[in-house]
Design a protein with these regions (language model features):
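Conserved, mostly hydrophobic/aromatic
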Residues: 48, 60, 82, 97, ...
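Alpha-helix-loop-beta-strand connector modules within alpha/beta enzyme cores
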Residues: 98-114, 169, 173
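N-terminal secretory signal peptides and thylakoid transit peptides that target proteins
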Residues: 2-21
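Glycine/proline-rich, positively charged
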Residues: 69, 120-233, 239, 249-250, ...
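Structured C-terminal cap/extension of enzyme domains
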Residues: 48, 200, 218, 222-396
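Glycine-rich, proline-tolerant flexible connector loops at the mouths of alpha/beta enzymes
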Residues: 83-102, 152-155
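Hydrophobic faces of well-ordered beta-strands that scaffold small-molecule active sites
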Residues: 56-60, 82-84, 113-115, 147, ...
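C-terminal segment of N-terminal export signals and the immediately downstream linker at the start
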Residues: 27-58, 76
Length: 396
């Protein structure tokens, strides 16, 4: 995948791949040492597969954010791609982006909008069409560049004829451009292969980090060869703040390093990151404009080694072993949002939306076959009970 060079030659970047013990380093050349970031940065815009869209190497992830001022600041910094969703809080993110774009005049023509909704088997054609129209209204626009079927867990979630018929109708009317999927499932490899074979999906918007999914790069290469573009998110591999702070010595930034790492993959077009204040816009713009250093590579290796038996890869092995049907992956994700992403209210809301039989209350008195099932040696039952305590503000 070619990228349009503006300042930094990324041919000297090292290619990193996930292995069982941490991060493996390969590729050619010598890593550049970290540079001091200035207040303005220039970075690349990469083609998003065969869509014809050019996306900024970092994109604005607006998860749960109602800040049109930040969105305008990101545009001023050169970020042209915004990832929002119609799923949360009555489309709050879409409304905020719509407000931000309403002040741009002709500049709004440069904005690439990525949004979507949960679309599942059994959903009606009219519901799909209504959801697309609702997103258009909230965004104050007449066209969505990429429309995602969100939070796809397995290939079965792609067997929705109404999705493809509804998308085709909306595309014929000029309302949407390209169909994609978003996912952070543990079964990423079979899902993405199924999506490639599906023939309808043009864009992947997926979790990608240096600890999980050792076979993911081969799948992304296959997708790229067929013209499917890839955007990624959650590059921080759990975002465990205490461990990160211990590693950030000598002015290193762990979040910046993970973005730089993801951009070493030529099959990744853009990294979506949560930009919650003006400083994060500056930090992530700087990350896209500067190479990955040898010190940053060492930091990522140390983190991967330390987190080997503590970071949930959402592989699903433990959940499959649970005799009580506990939603292990969802609960672990909500606990991560609560403890490490500053999204406490959302985490609690989503946990309490689970069916009662799927909550971690069911872990009381269980012998914990999930512990033995985890291929990474995590103490799954204890972590689920702790998650329940956090998300309920009371003991299980």
């Amino acid at each position: 995948m070619a990228s349009h060079r503006r300042t930094i030659d990324r041919r000297n970047f090292l290619k990193l791949g996930a292995v069982a013990s941490g991060v493996a380093v390969g590729g050619c050349g010598t890593p550049e040492e970290a540079t001091t970031a200035s207040s303005t940065f220039e970075f690349d815009y990469r083609p998003l597969g065969d869509t014809g869209l050019e996306v900024s190497e970092v994109s604005f992830g607006a998860h749960g954010l109602d800040r049109p001022d930040l969105m305008r600041a990101a545009l001023d910094a050169g970020i042209n791609t915004f990832c929002v969703s119609g799923n949360y809080l009555d489309g709050m993110e879409e409304k905020a982006l719509g407000e931000a774009m309403s002040t741009l005049g002709s500049r709004r023509d440069n904005v690439v909008i990525v949004t979507g909704n949960d679309i599942r088997p059994g959903m009606s054609l009219q519901r799909v069409l209504d959801d697309i129209d609702a997103s258009l209204r909230r965004l104050r626009t007449d066209h969505l560049h990429v429309y995602l079927t969100s939070d796809v867990r397995a290939s079965e979630d792609l067997r929705v004829d109404a999705l493809y018929e509804g998308f085709d109708r909306a595309k014929e009317a000029g309302k949407v451009g390209h169909l994609g999927l978003s996912s952070h499932t543990g079964g990423m490899q079979p899902l993405l292969n199924a999506a490639i074979d599906n023939g309808h999906i043009e864009v992947f918007f997926i979790k990608y980090d240096f600890v999980s999914y050792p076979d993911q790069d081969a799948i992304l290469r296959r997708a790229a060869e067929l013209g499917i573009g890839t955007m990624v998110f959650k590059t921080n591999a759990g975002n465990r703040q205490r461990e990160i702070k211990d590693l950030e010595a000598g002015g290193l930034s762990f979040p910046q390093a993970t973005v730089k790492w993801a951009l070493t993959n030529p099959y990744v077009s853009s990294v979506s990151v949560s930009m919650t204040n003006f400083d994060t816009i500056r930090q992530y713009s700087a990350a896209a404009a500067t190479p990955l250093s040898s010190a940053e590579i060492a930091m990522l290796r140390r983190y991967a080694d330390e987190m080997y038996d503590r970071y949930c890869r959402f592989c699903g092995e433990c959940e499959a072993s649970c005799p009580r049907g506990v939603a292990v992956a969802d609960i672990n994700r909500f606990a991560m949002y609560f403890s490490y992403y500053g999204r406490e209210k959302e985490a609690m809301r989503r946990y309490h939306a689970l069916p009662d039989r799927c909550s971690a209350k069911a872990c009381n008195g269980c012998t914990g076959p999930c512990d033995a099932a985890c291929p990474f040696g995590r103490l799954v039952r204890a972590e689920l009970l702790e998650a329940h305590r956090l998300l309920c503000f009371k003991e299980a």
